[in-house]
A protein has these predicted regions:
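Extended, subdomain-level signal for the structured scaffold at the beginning of enzyme domains
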Residues: 1-124, 137-147, 158-203
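Short, thiol/selenol-centered motifs that function as redox-active sites or metal-ligating centers
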Residues: 131-135
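Active-site-adjacent substrate-recognition loops and nearby beta-strands
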Residues: 154
Length: 203
């Protein structure tokens, strides 16, 4: 892979509280080294910015935080070359039906800005999409988008992905490329997943 291979490309990464620090660091450094611009996005709930905190899955583990000042409702996914849903429970949080604290309804399942953003990206085959680990949860409100797509995911998400009509492919590599959609089993597979995304962009 050549230096600055993604010069001029733009990457949108949807994330939330409970993000995995080394995953987001990998994107920030990896895409920047290749020349791409990286934008992290989350629900800002009307604020100018929000501080989100990392996942903690063991006693005594250090908690990290990051400030995010971009809301997917203010951006067009068609302005990006790559759109990624970060791992862990970020996708669950991003599915919250606005306004925060509302009871919502079945008719509003697709209204969260991050869901709309990722769905719109899925409708554009020129954009390379990626969902790592639990990331495909962002699309379960849109089964018509997942129907028939070949994917891999963490087994925690498998029932939901199956019920949404996706085709589960338990590939030994832990990475599945289905045309413009790249998925991987878990954050442990970040190296192969990242390479698959870049290679898909480069054609």
């Amino acid at each position: 892979m050549s230096f600055k291979a993604l010069q001029g490309k733009k990457v949108a990464i949807l994330t939330e509280t409970e993000y995995i620090p080394h995953e987001l660091d990998y994107y920030s450094i990896g895409f920047s080294v290749l020349g791409a611009t990286v934008d992290f996005m989350t629900n800002l709930w009307g604020e100018a910015s929000r501080t989100i905190v990392s996942d903690v899955d063991a006693p005594g583990k250090q908690v990290y935080s990051m400030e995010v000042d971009k809301d997917p409702k203010d951006y067009n996914p068609n302005d990006y070359d790559i759109v990624l849903m970060s791992a862990n429970y970020c996708s669950v949080r991003l599915r919250e039906i606005p306004p925060m604290g509302s009871l919502g309804s079945i008719e509003e399942l697709q209204t969260p800005p991050a869901v709309q953003f990722f769905k719109a990206a899925m409708l554009n085959p020129q954009i390379v999409k990626g969902a790592l680990c639990h990331g495909l949860w962002i699309l379960t409100p849109c089964p018509e988008i997942l129907q028939g797509r070949r994917v891999i995911c963490h087994t925690v998400v498998l029932a939901d992905i199956h019920n949404a009509g996706a085709v589960y492919v338990p590939d030994p590599s832990h990475v599945v490329v289905d045309d413009d959609l790249v998925t991987a089993r878990s954050a442990a597979d970040i190296d192969a997943y990242f390479d698959a995304i870049v290679n898909r962009v480069l054609g």
